Design a protein with these regions (language model features):
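Electropositive polyanion-binding surfaces
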Residues: 1-282, 286-287
Length: 287
């Protein structure tokens, strides 16, 4: 990695918003950052045209300082969008490269929602008075995306985001290319984070073999790639469960300091034991 400048999301956002002091300090980077912003906007428009779903379900940002816990919603800024768009394009390009040469690949697959879940989501929207005329047996990503666009300035936006996400299938790793529903992508993999995600590392090794004239050796890795995809999906599920458990502990500790307080919340689900509400940047069950 040839790192010329140690930049942060907040710095880049401030520069692109015209912070005079930072623009002077990083004057040599400003033209490139402006070009990156322009390119990211083009890529976002391109994804939007093909029907990609831009979910904005804000995860909780947890900051622990001893026994003091702060929970807030992660903020997505233009700098986050730039990196997101560039990563998506890189991941698609690499997946298409390996698929084009009929070489093995650990694909990132996101299947379309099941008919049952899509029908449940449509019924939920109809109860809210939101027009939803998609066919549950063959819903397309663009139809989900249009619903979010329609509700962008509505108080229903956050909760519909959350319920829409629950109606979708969970993404997984696979040796078979099944496309990515959420991104409306025909061919997708994880390539951009090999230092922290094993599937990315496997994909890097496959690309290295392919461009190094060792495509035959890459072809022989098909069985290994299938095992790597399966094990990575299983490991991801375990990691997600552990992360949720730890986050919930922090959120409970945070809410202890707000006992007895009232806050506005949005009901995002109903169960036999109570309701789920979004408030204090926390999704909680209320009995």
């Amino acid at each position: 990695i040839c790192s010329r400048n140690r930049m942060t999301y907040s710095k880049v956002t401030a520069i692109l918003e015209g912070d005079e002091a930072l623009c002077r300090e990083y004057a040599h980077l400003v033209p490139m950052l402006e070009d990156m912003k322009a390119l990211a906007e083009i890529l976002m428009q391109k994804r939007d045209r093909r029907g990609s779903i831009d979910l904005d379900v804000r995860e909780a940002k947890i900051v622990a300082d001893g026994e003091n816990i702060e929970v807030s919603a992660y903020e997505r800024t233009i700098s986050h969008h730039i990196i997101e768009e560039f990563m998506i394009l890189a991941n698609e390009t690499v997946a298409e490269f390996l698929a084009g040469y009929e070489l093995p690949c650990v694909y990132r697959v996101h299947e379309k929602p099941s008919e049952e879940k899509a029908a449940g989501f449509r019924a939920y929207l109809q109860e809210l008075g939101v027009k939803a005329d998609f066919r549950p047996e063959n819903v397309r990503p663009g139809e989900y995306g249009k619903i979010l666009e329609k509700l962008e300035d509505s108080e229903l936006f956050r909760v519909v985001n959350r319920v829409m996400l629950r109606s979708m299938s969970k993404a997984k790793y696979s040796a078979e290319n099944g496309g990515h529903f959420g991104l409306a992508s025909r061919c997708y993999c994880h390539f951009t984070s090999p230092i922290r995600r094993y599937p990315d590392l496997v994909v890097h090794r496959l690309v290295k073999l392919a461009i190094g004239g060792q495509a035959g050796e890459a072809e022989q890795m098909a069985a290994f790639v299938a095992r790597a995809a399966n094990e990575s999906s299983n490991a991801e599920r375990r990691a997600d469960e552990a992360e949720r458990a730890v986050d919930e502990l922090y959120k409970v500790w945070y809410m202890r300091s707000h006992l007895g307080e009232e806050c506005d919340a949005v009901v995002s689900g109903v169960a036999a034991f109570g309701v789920f509400g979004l408030g204090f940047a926390v999704l909680a069950a209320v009995k």
